[in-house]
Structure formats: C-alpha cells, structure tokens
Amino acid sequence: MIYKVFYQETKERSPRREKTRALYLEIEAANELEGRIQARKLIEENTPYNIEFIELLSDKHLEYEKESGTFELTEF
C-alpha cells in the first residue's frame, strides 16, 4: 500500500498550509489503520517532522500522483 504523508519540516513552529510538504511511503500492512500506524512510527523514528495527515492512496490517486511528476517513494 502507498501512503501520502503531509508534514511540516519542524515541530518548533505552528503548522502553516503554505509550508506543508508531502512524501510517499510503501507500507506492507494488513489494513489501512495498521499502515497508518507503521507510517507514523517510521517518520517519527527517522525525521524531526510534524505529521499533519496520512492518506492511503487509491489506484486512481496514485496514477495521478505519478503523472504529476512529484511522486517519489521515500525509504528509511
């Protein structure tokens, strides 16, 4: 499953929509909730990011992300 994670680069400042960034993770999980938990754990262990939202991408959404040119899987 591919998850899109929206985040702020630091926890020091209050979140601002204009500064929101995204990364993509491939997670092997039994269900969506387990995948979100694993994604959050991976990011918290490997980055100082402030996570805003974690979204499971549908097949159509994934195709759109790939076509937009911003899609790149992040590995830790």
Curated annotation (Swiss-Prot):
It comes from the Bacteria. One of its GO terms (molecular function) is DNA binding. RNAP is composed of a core of 2 alpha, a beta and a beta' subunit. The core is associated with a delta subunit, and at least one of epsilon or omega. When a sigma factor is associated with the core the holoenzyme is formed, which can initiate transcription. GO terms for cellular component: DNA-directed RNA polymerase complex. This is DNA-directed RNA polymerase subunit epsilon. InterPro entries: RpoY. Gene3D superfamilies: RNAP, epsilon subunit-like. Belongs to the RNA polymerase subunit epsilon family. Its EC number is 2.7.7.6. It catalyses: RNA(n) + a ribonucleoside 5'-triphosphate = RNA(n+1) + diphosphate. Keywords: DNA-directed RNA polymerase, Nucleotidyltransferase, Transcription, Transferase. One of its GO terms (biological process) is DNA-templated transcription. It is an enzyme of class 2 (transferase). A non-essential component of RNA polymerase (RNAP).
